[in-house]
Curated annotation (Swiss-Prot):
Belongs to the universal ribosomal protein uL4 family. This is Large ribosomal subunit protein uL4. Residues 64-77 have a biased composition (Basic residues). It comes from Rhizobium rhizogenes (strain K84 / ATCC BAA-868). GO terms for biological process: translation. The gene is rplD.
Length: 206
């Protein structure tokens, strides 16, 4: 499969061949969903915490005598049914991470790339290089290309001017090829790959 290559100025810069093993798969929502759940679970801090009845600062003495009052039997005011009592089965500090086989993660990435290409949301640029770290100039180039919501994937080393200039543009993300992931691909409208990124992906999955 061949796609046209463009420059940041919108000019043609030849063609590039894309591997069907990476960009030509039939998308599977179940695999993609599993990978995204795995990614988001890893990102969770897990620092949520509620005090249980053993942890609240309150006397543990019996509230009133057992018999003779006509009221319900109670012991400590730390019990969860009372205002200020401990939370029953509340959240505790923990890790939300879970395992996902490496082969499934790799397949999920190829499926996400294939889904973007099938939706005609993949653009190939010859390189991601900016002459100056000027946001205004780069934003104008993106507007010319019709890129208002996009993920840019460069080579192993990003051009510092391009990265700095793109940092202040809303809805634009820039990552090196080793940072490419399913969640970021799907959360942005367009996927913009440099020729170096395409070569690195094909080397990674061959």
């Amino acid at each position: 499969m061949e796609l046209n290559v463009k420059t940041l100025e919108g000019k043609d810069a030849g063609k590039v061949s894309l591997s069907d093993a990476i960009f030509g798969l039939e998308p599977r929502e179940d695999i993609i969903a599993r990978v995204i759940r795995w990614q988001l679970a890893k990102k969770r801090q897990g620092t949520h915490k509620a005090q249980g009845r053993a942890e609240v600062s309150r006397t543990g003495a019996k509230m009133y005598k057992q018999k003779g009052t006509g009221r319900a039997r109670h012991h400590s005011a730390r019990a969860p049914q009372f205002r200020g009592g401990g939370k029953a089965h509340g959240p505790v500090v923990r890790s939300h991470e879970h395992d996902l086989p490496k082969k499934v993660r790799a397949l999920g990435l190829r499926l996400a790339l294939s889904a973007k290409l099938k939706a005609e949301d993949v653009i190939i640029l010859d390189n991601l290089v900016a002459a100056d770290a000027k946001t205004k100039a780069l934003a104008g180039a993106f507007e010319t290309l019709g890129l208002t919501n996009a993920l840019f994937i460069g080579g192993a080393e990003l051009d510092s001017n391009f990265k700095l200039a793109a940092a202040n543009i809303p809805n634009i993300d820039v990552l090196p090829v080793q940072g490419i992931n399913v969640y970021d691909i799907l959360r942005r409208g367009k996927l913009v790959l440099s020729k170096a990124a395409v070569e690195a992906l094909e080397e990674r999955f061959k």
